[in-house]
Amino acid sequence: MTASSVEQLRKEGNELFKCGDYGGALAAYTQALGLDATPQDQAVLHRNRAACYLKLEDYDKAETEASKAIEKDGGDVKALYRRSQALEKLGRLDQAVLDLQRCVSLEPKNKVFQEALRNIGGQIQEKVRYMSSTDAKVEQMFQILLDPEEKGTEKKQKASQNLVVLAREDAGAEKTLRSNGVQLLQRLLDTGETDLMLAALRTLVGICSEHQSRTVATLSILGTRRVVSILGVESQSVSLAACHLLQVMFDALKEGVKKGFRGKEGAIIVDPARELKVLISNLLDLLTEVGVSGQGRDNALTLLIKAVPRKSLKDPNNSLTLWVIDQGLKKILEVGGSLQDPPGELAVTANSRMSASILLSKLFDDLKCDAERENFHRLCENYIKSWFEGRGLAGKLRAIQTVSCLLQGPCDAGNRALELSGVMEGVIALCASEQEEEQLVAVEALIHAAGKAKRASFITANGVSLLKDLYKRSEKDSIRIRALVGLCKLGSAGGTDFSMKQFAEGSTLKLAKQCRKWLCNDQIDAGTRRWAVEGLAYLTFDADVKEEFVEDAAALKALFQLSRSEERSVLFAVASALVNCTNSYDYEEPDPKMVELAKYAKQHVPEQHPKDKPSFVRARVKKLLAAGVVSAMVYMVKTESPVLTSSCRELLSRIFLALVEEVEDRGTVVAQGGGRALIPLALEGTDVGQTKAAQALAKLTITSNPEMTFPGERIYEVVRPLVSLLHLNCSGLQNFEALMALTNLAGISERLRQKILKEKAVPMIEGYMFEEHEMIRRASTECMCNLAMSKEVQDLFEAEGNDRLKLLVLYSGEDDELLQRAAAGGLAMLTSMRPTLCSRIPQVTTHWLEILQALLLSSNQELQHRGAVVVLNMVEASREIASTLMESEMMEILSVLAKGDHSPVTRAAAACLDKAVEYGLIQPNQDGE
């Protein structure tokens, strides 16, 4: 019974493979392997799994499966050939040629093997020629750089730039490494000349990119400490280049194996985790080193943000995060608690504290259980206590600044720190200080503390008078603006709920007016003006404030200019204000019955502001578009900064979706680069943010020419986000818009259709063809009609044992004219490309003839034409089918249509009758017609 089950599953897998369902075939073969299969059966199953992986383009697994088959049967030529195919794709040509030579020796007359051997031999010769020329080029560059007689720096710079280009190719990278190139590059780094240092760092990027062994060799030669120390130089461009190099090294050590290397690995890495920890340990040490530039410290934080936390919470291993918390949490807090003005021991920038907050937040979010979180809290509290107790006023300032850093990041840890003995009292006391820097630290802490509704209520009761006093009496704008933001934050504690206002009517409008005034004041530095945006981000929950804000052209211009400044920490506040103005947050209309019930139970019911109705929102969106919001957002998306967090990206996605809601606004968004900016938002960020961005992409793809909206290769990047909208967890509208957009893309080129197929969209599109909602059903049928131009989709329709063709025939007879048109178009396409399908149409339903006749008798000329083409294809495919058609009323219908004008319908009908005459089924009349 087991043997028959294995055989049955193998045959089932073979059928699925023939139908193009490679994932299903793979599952069948895997299930068969789990049974008690004989060694011979196991060899066949592994060989078949290799074929599936080749089709799925997973060449590493294809090689593994083929090797397992060869272990069972060394003379299995199919397995040898499949392994050679996988090895060729992996770039291991020398191993691939050995397998092909064995294939040829086993089957000398097999022309496929001979041709494959000739092709791969040509590739090897080409690679040898290229390697030879590359060797010469690398040596030439080295001679110029090493020549002590060469005084001209321009020639040396050109040589070093050529090395950068060569190192991007595998052969050049290998040659550079073998020719003691890393030692030479180290000498370039030691020169201290910016141009030469940049060229050396970029060459090292090429050497290490996606190659674990070369990365380890480079670190071994240069020294991890030396590489990391380059981050701390004063030159911003050199520090950024070093940051890029370290990111490439992290990728090579952490994920390089998964990406598929170019060429063979030249060394075996016993424990890449050790190399990772050494790199991270050096980065943590750099954070607290005196003499390191502020930009370098920010870059180190950025690297830690990207490298340490898990990419997905589904990954069970968070050991690296736990190790960093134990070894480096105090060092991160050291940066978060440092003051920019007056400068302390550690040089920091305006963005350093925000970067530290983001890193702390990501580390905290990466923890899995209460014990791990409790350890995090304990370390933070111990650090704050160590500064707060017994260190005088300077220590208290440092402690409060650290609390602010935590409140901006892992706010749970920040709130617990606020509850430590004396901290809140210290904040209140320092607000009354005569020293500006002390007041700044205290007021900022008070602002961040007001984030929670519970604490906001406490501060409203106890701290509002203090903030008002600071706002009215302070002579320093930097203090007044922060006090104002504190008041703004407390005034917006009710959110969008019109019935919950913390302050008297009109107070929020006065606060907003002052915020706009400061925002427009160019004399105030960007770091201080950022706080005005923070205030507006809170106040724009109020619809009256939104209306005044979008009417203020100068304020909008200042806002967009500030978003382009070096003050990166303003991005979230800008995005928050724009989300509020466009009402692009999620809002569900409450059920009227539930509202009545809540009122009866005397429960609070949120009320919407009258100026938040759709007509007001649409007007605000148009004003923002006219003010240039799209170009500002495009710039924000391009920002390479940890401040552009997943939540910030989500806000930008929400705004874009609101901007493209109206069809007439989409041209403006596309013209200012919005289409290109949406692609990265749809590929990275929170699930909600990616979905919103994908939906905005779908709207643009539906109403504008995709080739103009997404020029060049970008159009292929749009496919994956659109396919993600087909998942069942998306709304019906999102499904519909994705189908419409994919229909447009599928009609452009075969390469785009192949991309859609590769993203496994066809099964989902087929599923929606059975959807009850008529618009979704119609859109999916139209999409399938365009995809039917691809050979793979035609194979699916031609495969035995499925109802795909039947569904199209039945839909061609539906009452929905648009659905009819899509289905009939698909039928016309398929019967033209695959004549064998013509003979199967009469088999799928007994109503086929009625359906075709109804198409030809339709008043819609498009339906008539599609029906006439289907009938013509069937007549040309088989005399037997033609006979059946001519014996029915179809002949009379065709005769009438053939007497019309010179339309496509007339020509198709006449061609049907001519073919019937040729078969001898009918006779031409006396007039020769």
UniProtKB/Swiss-Prot annotation:
GO terms for biological process: cell differentiation; chaperone-mediated protein folding; muscle organ development. One of its GO terms (molecular function) is Hsp90 protein binding. SUPFAM superfamilies: ARM repeat (SSF48371), TPR-like (SSF48452). It is found in: Cytoplasm; Cytoplasm, Perinuclear region; Nucleus. InterPro entries: ARM-like, ARM-type_fold, TPR-like_helical_dom_sf, TPR_rpt, UCS_central_dom. The modification N6-acetyllysine is found at K55, K468. TPR repeats lie at residues 6-39, 43-76, 77-110. The keyword Chaperone applies. Keywords: Acetylation, Chaperone, Cytoplasm, Developmental protein, Differentiation, Myogenesis, Nucleus, Repeat, TPR repeat. GO terms for cellular component: nucleus; perinuclear region of cytoplasm. Gene3D superfamilies: Leucine-rich Repeat Variant, Tetratricopeptide repeat domain. The keyword Transcription regulation does not apply. It comes from the Eukaryota. May act as co-chaperone for HSP90 (Potential). Prevents the stimulation of HSP90AB1 ATPase activity by AHSA1. Positive factor in promoting PGR function in the cell. May be necessary for proper folding of myosin (Potential). Necessary for normal cell proliferation. Necessary for normal myotube formation and myosin accumulation during muscle cell development. May play a role in erythropoiesis in stroma cells in the spleen. This is Protein unc-45 homolog A. It comes from Pongo abelii. The gene is UNC45A.
